Design a protein with these regions (language model features):
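Short, surface-exposed patches at the edges or C-terminal ends of soluble domains, predominantly
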Residues: 18-317
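Sec-dependent signal peptide recognition
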Residues: 2-7
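Hydrophobic h-region of N-terminal signal peptides that target proteins for export
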Residues: 8-18
C-alpha cells in the first residue's frame, strides 16, 4: 500500500511541475503602493543560472506585483560580479540550477552541484555587506543542492530534499503538499514581514507549496518555522520516492528566515510557488498567490520586499 501511495505522489507532483504556467490575470489590489510608479528601488531577478523561475517566465506575476508597487523590475543573465551587481538594489535568485540539473537537461538527480562559482558567491556576499539586499528562493531538491554554498555564506544549511509533515498514524507517507504557516499555529513568527506598514497590511496566514527546509544559524531570524512533525525526504532523484527514501527530522528548522549582513539585508525562503501565481496541470489549478487558501501570500511578499528595501513606514525599516 505504501508503495502505491509513493507512486501516486510521484505521478501527481511531477505532472504538475511539468505544466506550471504563470497566471497573468492575477492582479490583487495595492491601495497604498510603497513607491511612485517606476520610481522605486531596482529589483534584478536572476536569469543567468538556469533558473526554473525568471522575471519573464514563471515569476512574471512576482515581477508584475512588484512593478505595481513602484519597484523597477528587470531580469539579468549576467554572472554575479561587483560591476554587474551595481545595477541592483535588490537581487532576487529563484531556483537557480547548475547546467547538469537544468530544466532542459531533464536531470533532477544527484549530484546537484552549485549553480554559482566561488567568485560569484564572494561577490554577492561583499555586495550585501556593503548595503545590497538579497532575496534567495530555493525550492525542493535539486534546488537546495544548487544553492547550498550560497546559503552557507549567509549562515543557513539546506536539506537537499522535500519538506513535509509526517502522517500522525504512520500509515501514509509524509505529506509534501501545501503547508500552512499561521500566527495561530505558531509557525509564522511575528515581525515586519507580518505587520506591514499598517493594520491593513497585517498578515496572519501564509501557505507554501512543496519546498525545502533549512537550518538557521545563530544570526538568522526565523520567519516560517517548521513544526514537530516536519521531515525532509531526500531522494536521489526529484519526486522518486519510496519506502526507503531517507527522512531527515527538521522540526524547528525554517522554510523562511531573514538576517542582517553588514549594511545589507537577506531574506531566504525554501519555496518558490508561494511568491508567484501559477496555473498547474491540465485543469489549470491555481497554485501560489492565486490559490484560494493563500489570500495573504501577496501581502506577505510585499511586506518582505518592503523590509528588504527599507520602505518608509516599515517597522525596523
Amino acid at each position: 500500500m505504501k508503495n502505491t501511495l509513493f507512486a501516486l505522489a510521484l505521478l501527481v507532483a511531477s505532472s504538475a511541475r511539468a505544466q506550471q504556467v504563470p497566471d497573468t490575470g492575477f492582479k490583487p489590489p495595492i491601495p497604498n503602493p510603497a513607491y511612485a510608479s517606476g520610481r522605486g528601488p531596482r529589483v534584478v531577478v536572476d536569469g543567468g543560472h538556469h533558473n526554473f523561475h525568471t522575471a519573464d517566465g514563471r515569476y512574471l506575476p512576482f515581477a508584475a506585483l512588484l512593478r505595481r508597487d513602484g519597484y523597477r523590475v528587470s531580469g539579468s543573465t549576467s554572472p554575479f560580479t561587483a560591476d554587474s551587481l551595481k545595477s541592483a538594489d535588490i537581487l532576487v535568485i529563484a531556483n537557480a540550477l547548475a547546467a547538469v540539473n537544468s530544466e532542459a537537461s531533464g536531470n533532477w538527480a544527484l549530484p546537484t552541484p552549485s549553480a554559482f562559482s566561488a567568485d560569484e558567491i564572494a561577490a554577492v556576499k561583499r555586495w550585501v555587506e556593503a548595503g545590497g539586499a538579497l532575496f534567495l528562493i530555493v525550492d525542493h531538491m535539486p534546488m537546495p543542492g544548487a544553492a547550498g554554498d550560497l546559503g552557507r555564506a549567509f549562515g543557513v544549511e539546506f536539506s537537499n530534499g522535500f519538506a513535509g509533515l509526517k502522517d500522525p498514524t504512520g500509515a501514509r507517507p509524509p505529506n509534501i503538499g501545501p503547508m500552512a504557516f499561521t500566527v495561530a499555529n505558531g509557525r509564522l513568527e511575528k515581525g515586519p514581514w507580518s505587520e506591514g506598514r499598517s493594520a491593513a497590511e497585517r498578515v496572519e496566514s501564509v501557505i507554501t507549496f512543496t519546498g525545502s527546509a533549512f537550518y538557521p544559524g545563530p544570526k538568522v531570524t526565523p520567519v516560517l518555522r517548521l513544526p514537530e512533525a516536519a521531515v525532509s525526504l531526500t531522494p536521489s532523484a526529484a519526486f522518486e520516492f519510496g519506502p526507503e527514501t531517507p527522512r531527515v527530522p527538521v522540526a524547528g528548522w525554517c522554510q523562511g528566515a531573514v538576517l542582517e549582513a553588514g549594511k545589507g539585508r537577506v531574506a531566504i525562503f525554501g519555496e518558490a510557488a508561494m511568491f508567484t501565481a501559477q496555473l498547474a496541470g491540465p485543469q489549470k489549478s491555481p497554485m501560489g498567490m492565486n490559490a484560494p487558501e493563500a489570500k495573504q501570500n501577496f501581502q506577505f511578499l510585499l511586506n518582505l520586499v518592503h523590509w528588504l528595501s527599507r520602505a518608509a513606514g516599515m517597522p525596523n525599516g
